[in-house]
């Protein structure tokens, strides 16, 4: 069976850097940080009091006020990003064969804010009995964002959610890619969303000592590949990529951002939260994606790394890149856009895939910000080009995106310039 080709024809994004793909990409290229003191709850007693929040978003510009109240914030963000993506791809909803269009979205946690609100209320007022909101369960469950997107547009194709912690939306893109190239759909609205900046989310990650506590300087807290890194910065947001079968896209005259050419998955099988210290799973997943794409290491010009700004994770990923890419590792660009967006958890893979697509389209690599001279980690090889502090213009023929999740889940996707 000859596999069909898959292209990216639309983008959507709501992130700490901007409420559209254009705003987000411009801020990435400029090296802006989305970190600031937390506004969504009183974090004054928490070890970490800052995060990368979505800012200045009026949800009711996109979603009817009454409907918005039925949605957890993560679902609101997912639906808005999907609306942007579908609009951007230029699909005629009146004539489209909606039976051949699906939705595959990734979510790492789901409606944790809704869960916190409902359970906290009951815990404070048990004498009132179990008076739960009838939308408690539908707002909370992790699969509901893809369901709302499908319902909103009337898409009857494959519809489900992938959940693999921080690899969730990369797994969603991989599944969407495979559904299309196997001929099971013409178009998939894919991506991911997360919004867990609440007491449970921040408190839980604080208890694990996973978050940066640089409360006096939030904008410089996320600093992947620097010796003074002290944990990741929590973020929220959503990203959407419209993946489409090439001939279907050409037939309707769609613009094409890039071609998706490969994906890979692997497991560390090592620890519930820590990366394998030698980067075993990272090595396996990049090798799998390259093989799937039919590309050699020297064909990749940019790697958007998982790069969360944790001690073990950054070192192990850099080791894996050197092992997989050999001499080519020193000729490509590496960057972590988490230095700007923070860690978007289940949405990370989608937003970082978008960064890869736009890097391929525009021949520019966004930076890894916040590195300072003299802040080198002796366990890292700075012969690698981490694209510190300033975007770099270069030809980007193909870009690879890594995402790794708690539980040892690893996923990788590759995009390249579209050519007939």
PLM regions and their residue ranges:
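Active-site-proximal alpha-helical scaffold in enzymes
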Residues: 78-91, 145-146, 150-153, 159-194, ...
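Flexible, low-complexity linker/loop segments at domain and module junctions
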Residues: 1-8, 95-98, 293-299, 330, ...
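ACP-dependent fatty acid/polyketide chain-elongation machinery
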Residues: 1-67, 89, 247-259, 354-368, ...
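Glycine-/small-residue-rich "gating" segment that lines the acyl/pantetheine channel
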Residues: 124-133, 174, 178, 194-251, ...
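Condensing-enzyme catalytic core mediating Claisen C-C bond formation in acyl metabolism
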Residues: 5-9, 36, 216-293, 302, ...
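Acyl-CoA/ACP chain-elongation machinery
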Residues: 39, 184-230, 263-277, 307-315, ...
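Conserved small-residue
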Residues: 10, 28, 82, 103, ...
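Conserved beta-ketoacyl condensing-enzyme motif
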Residues: 8, 24, 32-164, 193-204, ...
